[in-house]
Amino acid sequence: MACSGFQSHGAWLELTSRTWPCTALFSLLFIPVFSKGMHVAQPAVVLANSRGVASFVCEYGSAGKAAEVRVTVLRRAGSQMTEVCAATYTVEDELTFLDDSTCTGTSTENKVNLTIQGLRAVDTGLYICKVELLYPPPYYVGMGNGTQIYVIDPEPCPDSDFLLWILAAVSSGLFFYSFLITAVSLSKMLKKRSPLTTGVYVKMPPTEPECEKQFQPYFIPIN
């Protein structure tokens, strides 16, 4: 009995010695996630422009200086969170979103300037900036309160062919109106000139006076 108890105790010690490195690694990786928080600030409201582009700044603060950072943009719709885009970059290099052309950004010190493109009215919602400081340890993670992005779809432009038809109709109407006014004006001018002359020259005989005086010669006799 003593021998069997000693064997079981030895097996437990051997199992503990084998699993201790894994337990220590687990503790080093996951305990800092919950113990090292980070504040992330972002604007409360942003209005996208007419082309569906919205820009906002994510500013994070931490005690250490990170060399490798990961930025993730999340969209909250009700109780669900969906990832819009994400990128991992080093402080020395430029922030680039390789897998998604929806987002672009630049980084300066502890600020990340994010731009989201191709937004429509249905994309209006709360966009949350998540920042992770990956290297060097310890691991920091923080999420902002979110930026409410409002998107207004621009009114559709009218068809260019339709505009051409309208322009042609208006031009034709103006031309017909000017032609009608010109014709009426010429007609009135001709009517005014008709009582003055018929346009045909007729040679008329000279007229004699109705009453022509007759003069008798008057002679004075000379003796």
From Swiss-Prot:
Signal peptide (from-to): 1-35
Entry's localization field: Cell membrane
Region of interest: Important for interaction with CD80 and CD86: 134-139
Membrane topology summary: Single-pass type I membrane protein
Extracellular side: 38-161
Residues recorded as bearing Phosphotyrosine in the entry: 201
Keywords (A to Z) from UniProt: Adaptive immunity, Cell membrane, Disulfide bond, Glycoprotein, Immunity, Immunoglobulin domain, Membrane, Phosphoprotein, Signal, Transmembrane, Transmembrane helix
Domain Ig-like V-type: 39-140
Oxidoreductase is among the record's keywords: no
Protein name per the record: Cytotoxic T-lymphocyte protein 4
Originating gene: CTLA4
